[in-house]
Regions:
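ADP-ribose/NAD+-binding catalytic cleft of ART/PARP-like enzymes
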Residues: 1-32, 50-51
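Compact, glycine/acidic-enriched structural inserts
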Residues: 42, 46-49
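Conserved NAD+-utilizing ADP-ribose enzyme module
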Residues: 1, 32, 51-158
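Glycine-rich nucleotide phosphate-binding loop and flanking beta-alpha elements
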Residues: 14-15, 46, 96-98
Length: 158
């Protein structure tokens, strides 16, 4: 994959330096690295800038599947965006990032943004949708299977 000049990161929090963190994407290995995640897809970063508010069970679960990419939508399985609040779109130099799959890039070091744009969440609600009841059941079933498999793998390693 060709190296891009700029990448994007979206968050509901404003910071001057993006610090590496351990990501936990139960579906893909590319989403389990320690680092600062960025994307070549501006809409994807904006969707993460919408933030997430837990539902009545205390859960906020959002997902982006291949079928939700044209047109782009982040699917809220549980919870909802932070309506009425601010989000932040970070424009980053691609220096130090390596491609980990799809639209995702990771840098293991702290990253100073080139530019930070404050957004109104309500201006970007077209980038999300709620999961249907059927989708929610399918996604949560797959999640439970993955958790069970993960626990079994940890037990089998001992």
């Amino acid at each position: 994959m060709r190296k891009l000049r700029y990448l994007y990161h979206g968050s509901s929090k404003r910071v001057n330096i993006l610090m590496p963190q351990l990501a936990d994407d139960w579906r893909f290995e590319a989403g389990r690295h320690f680092g600062v995640y960025a994307t070549s897809n501006r809409d994807l970063a904006l969707a993460f800038a919408l933030g997430g508010v837990p539902d009545e069970t205390g859960t906020c679960h959002r997902i982006i599947r291949e079928k939700d990419r044209k047109p782009f939508k982040m699917t809220f399985v549980r919870g909802h965006p932070k309506f009425g609040s601010k989000g932040y779109l970070y424009k980053l130099s691609s220096r130090g990032f390596h491609h980990v799959g799809g639209d995702q890039w990771v840098c293991e070091n702290p990253v100073k943004p080139i530019k930070i744009a404050e957004i109104n969440v309500d201006d970007y609600i077209h980038l999300f949708r709620y999961a249907t009841l059927k989708e929610r059941c399918e996604i949560e079933r797959a999640f439970r299977k993955q958790i069970k498999r993960s626990k079994e793998n940890k037990i089998n390693k001992w």
